[in-house]
Amino acid sequence: MADIVLINPRFEMSYWGLEHALPLVGKKCNLPTACLPLLAALTPVGHRVSIVDENVEPIDYDRVSRADVVGLTGMTVQRGRMREILRELKARGVFTVVGGPWVSVQEDYFDGLADVIFVGEAETTWPRFLDEWTRGAHRRRYEQTEQTDMTRVPVPRYDLLKVKEYLFGSIQFSRGCPFQCEFCDI
């Protein structure tokens, strides 16, 4: 089966990053959102998954280049770094997939850089992609249109993170807002 590496790109310096306070307590950053540990938990048995959080450790491009699939996620503040990473991986001939909040609102930002794009949540599309990829029949774009049933979401694979490096973590018990007010963008 596949060797999969999931990457959380480093954040740019920001007010929210706590860069000045973290060294005082011996930590490197806050725990990223659970999306990559959740993707790891959604990955069918038989695939090997590892997670690289660039906010904690540098990307070993030689190691990552040997993976069958490399996935990136990111928010608006990570978009520039996401492009840098994708360019490097593309130059090395690596098969890449990209998803997350920024891709979901600006998917053409990564045109020509990623082999596959995920829009929206990925609880149903990630396993579907892996099945299709294994059979050599994957698509270029996946979009999950249905809401995720949070009662069926597996426990994220936090064991794949260096949890002692983080100041604090987060848990997820719901997503967004259940209302669909037309004036709101949540």
State each model region's role.
Residues 2-186:
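Acidic, low-complexity intrinsically disordered segments
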